Amino acid sequence: MSPNDTRLAGRTALVTGSTGGLGAAFATALAEQGAFVVVSGRDIARGLAVLDRISSTGATAAFVRADLSRGAAEVHRLAEEATTAAGGRIDVLVNNAAMLLAPAPTANVLEQQVTDAFAVNVVAPFLLTGIVAPRMAKRGHGSIVNIGSINGLIGMGGSALYSATKATIHSLTKSWADEYGPRGVRVNTVAPGPSLTERNADIAEQLAPLLARIPSRRASTLTEVAAAVVFLASDDASGINGATLSVDGGWSAI
């Protein structure tokens, strides 16, 4: 870290679903700004790789394995183990873990798929916030950044289920901002548009027709989306609560 990378010095952060892709970028960016980050996800090897990446920047972090599809007990375990790993408190919570869903007609989606998608994308962050936010409120400060999506902001045929889960996250942000804001806890959403990660880099050419519809004519970078998360987590955004910050190249504006 450079001497100027201290916006989050002395803070602790938990980033769910941070063993790869956007989540790993969020964890790394928060650590680079001085936060002690708890990385979390299902894959131990990938989690340790993210720790190595963070360590290479001169920052420190810990890893807590968690599979948020396993229900309330797993969410509670993550909250307690992450709090312990972070030295007794979590100052920043990034609700990033999500089940990505392939486009499909609504009529082809099975009931179990609906249950599974909402379990990870909605129920898990709902329960985790219900544990972490009151503790933040008791201390009088904290920042929660929910990761939404362009899918939760606009209509997108073939993506009804995923869009519904993300629209729910956007709604929860507003409710939680009102619930916890008076006690010093800010809750905001970052809503990414198309972004290239190691998981979808192989379909970059297939995204070309989609990107042609976006004012910026390109996908967002991981760094750009992570910068939005860092901003909302930091005191630079102290006056922002209940907002959705879109990082989509202007797609949601048209």
What are these regions (language model features)?
Residues T12, T19-G20, D43:
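Conserved glycine-rich cofactor-binding loop
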Residues A107, P182, T189-I214, E224, ...:
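A glycine/serine/threonine-rich, flexible loop-to-helix segment
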Residues S149:
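Residue(s) in the substrate-gating loop at a strand-loop-helix junction
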Residues P134, D178-P182, S238:
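Alpha-helical segment proximal to the catalytic Tyr-Lys
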Residues A104-T106, L110-F118, I144, N200, ...:
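Substrate-binding pocket helix/loop in short-chain dehydrogenase/reductase
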Residues F126, R218-A253:
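C-terminal substrate-recognition "lid" of short-chain dehydrogenase/reductases
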